[in-house]
Curated annotation (Swiss-Prot):
Region annotation Interaction with host EIF2S1/EIF-2ALPHA: where it falls in the sequence: 233-248
Start and stop residues of the Sequence repeats: 161-163, 164-166, 167-169, 170-172, 173-175, 176-178, 179-181, 182-184, 185-187, 188-190
Family membership: Belongs to the PPP1R15 family.
Superkingdom, taxonomy of origin: Viruses
Cellular component aspect of the GO annotation: host cell cytoplasm; host cell nucleolus; virion component
Compartments (UniProt record): Host cytoplasm; Host nucleus; Host nucleus, Host nucleolus; Virion
Gene transcribed to yield this protein: RL1
UniProt name for this protein: Neurovirulence factor ICP34.5
Originating organism: Human herpesvirus 1 (strain F)
Keywords of this entry: Host cytoplasm, Host nucleus, Host-virus interaction, Inhibition of host autophagy by virus, Inhibition of host innate immune response by virus, Inhibition of host interferon signaling pathway by virus, Inhibition of host RLR pathway by virus, Interferon antiviral system evasion, Modulation of host PP1 activity by virus, Repeat, Viral immunoevasion, Virion, Virulence
Region Important for interferon resistance, annotated ranges: 205-263
Amino acid sequence: MARRRRHRGPRRPRPPGPTGAVPTAQSQVTSTPNSEPAVRSAPAAAPPPPPASGPPPSCSLLLRQWLHVPESASDDDDDDDWPDSPPPEPAPEARPTAAAPRPRSPPPGAGPGGGANPSHPPSRPFRLPPRLALRLRVTAEHLARLRLRRAGGEGAPEPPATPATPATPATPATPATPATPATPATPATPARVRFSPHVRVRHLVVWASAARLARRGSWARERADRARFRRRVAEAEAVIGPCLGPEARARALARGAGPANSV
């Protein structure tokens, strides 16, 4: 005989527990007489610590290979990667105090006892290039010479003689210009530039008409061109006009109708 199931109505919602208590898998619901059921929660388990480095374990293999997880902030500020960074400051306890003098390290060429160390050869003295050393020596001598000259000391060395420059060929004197006697104001040593006391003025000859037309403008130049064309046409007509008259034409026809020119 089949067992008949009893129909139940809709379930009533459970009243919420006190604030701060969340029912978990390990919580127990207890009820007291004439009171609402109370929820006693067991201490929640601490979440698993995140992995030290690398992607979370729930990532796929592709994300584990290509996902970039930044490291701690202390690794980003590592000064060893930068060659020009200053050396790190020592700890407070490692810093030398005023009472305790800082020990001096021996030079690289000295041994533990203060003598020469055969493993480290002595460093060679620094030498300037020959050209720079020569220039430095000349500059030092020049400064010393100036210092002695300003102090007015006796026995100051003479300044170095300037290299002799090739003498420029003197220009031949023109016969029209008479030779002037040397005046006391003129220095005995010839200079490169000479100023003659005699001044000659040379007048430049220019075409007045061209200069006048240039001052007037283009319209005046065109008018002058038209006038010149009319003048030349009139001169040509005066020469060719007599040859085109009726008498000249009759003479030309008479010469052409002679027996020598007959067909």
